Amino acid sequence: MAAGAVTSTAPAREKPRLTFWQIWNMSFGFLGIQFGFALQNGNMSRIFETMGAKTDDIAILWLAAPTTGLLVQPIVGYFSDRTWSPRWGRRRPFFLVGAICASLALLVVPNVSALWMAAGMLWIMDSSINISMEPFRALVGDLLPAEQHTAGFGAQTFFIGIGAVIGSLLPPIYTKWLHVSNVAPAGQISPSLKYAFYTGALIYFLAVLWTVVTTREYPPANLEEFKAEKRLHSGFWYGIRESFAGVVHMPRTMRQLAVVQFFSWLALFSMWIYATPAITSHIYHTTDTTSKAYNDGADWVNVCFAVYNGVSALAALGLPIIARATSRRFTHMLCLVSGGIGLISIYFIGYIPAEQTVSLHLFGSYTFRVIELVLLIPMLGIGIAWSSILSVPYAMLAGALPSNRMGYYMGVFNFFIVLPQMVAGVTLGFFTKHLFNGASIFTLVLGGVSMILAGLITLWVNDDDDVQMMPGGEPTENFGYGTPATRA
């Protein structure tokens, strides 16, 4: 615990088990949040290139995302821990403010007319998404008893997957099914991408609003003590100092998971930044942003992202089974290695003959290149890794944190999501230009190596809250179901 914190003397409230629909409602906002992230992650590099950015400059432009995360997430976590309104609760005001700002940003982004405007809007959009997203993690610890933590994080992972699938598919849906053009003159965003962002803005706001309206939060266990701590330690600069001081006072499990997170998110960020330039150049053999081939390739990147997010949602159902039979550490390692192999394999897919096509009938007749369909195979491994990244580290972490500092430490933990992204933003452009001679496909390979390394490091994490699961018994915490048995 960071210095200066008031230690609670009130007995911990015994939280009632929530019903399926209560967990559903409290997690539903993640559906909308992921629409925003899906559109951002799948299309900002495309927008940057359309506005004239060079491939090796894209990474530095993406610095907006991790920088805002570094500043916003721990501060929002800190102040949401110290917020209480009888009407609005603790986390819900942040959900609503972030949703309003993010939805407005999604409306503006596809109408930018210059590179600096696109970069600036990424700052605003990512900050807003972080404001509404960060307290959702803490809400699980606030409302759910320990034995339902995994169910809570699993529900969030499910909505993250579903939201990302539909959000990622919005541009190709408008292009393929609704026949909106995906090509525009130089320096302009295509109509199909504009409509995708407009749709995402509406869904983002409505989904988060649903959680705000349907979820009720518990007041602090000792309201007078809570008010005393708030008066003592509620200053803005105190909050910033406490947030960043949390890195020094992290529990052991949190420190170890931080290393795993670093290499995991370095890999993910390399994919989000360079998937569009890598696939359009290595698979579609073009860098002309006004060409149909480039925009078809950029649309297919969204399809790839939809597939890995769909796999993530399904994998979330199977991860507890694997963890029950083995351990959370082994499960996370296995998933990360699968994702790393998937990223590396994209390089080899580029050598499949590009002329072969196949016709599929799905809400109409469509012709695809075989290489496009094969490109979906690596997304299976990436989706499995993504599912684990979104749930297993948080399930491991929740048991190692004091309940009255849950939002605070969840915010601090996000440092190790944004720090590797900042490292990627500063270094990947240099590597792409000078090490890989501008071939961004090798940046994806580097990301795959980083993800495999993260998986291997997971085996050294102390997960004292995890237990071996035996068949049968009541639902328990620790990522599975069954009667706990002592681990040797």
Task: Cite the ranges covered by each PLM segment.
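Intracellular juxtamembrane helix-capping segments at the cytosolic ends
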Residues: 131-144, 388-402
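Helix-loop boundary and gating motifs at the non-cytosolic
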Residues: 8-68, 256-260, 264-288
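Loop-to-transmembrane helix entry/capping segments in MFS-fold secondary transporters
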Residues: 55-56, 146-156, 298, 401-413
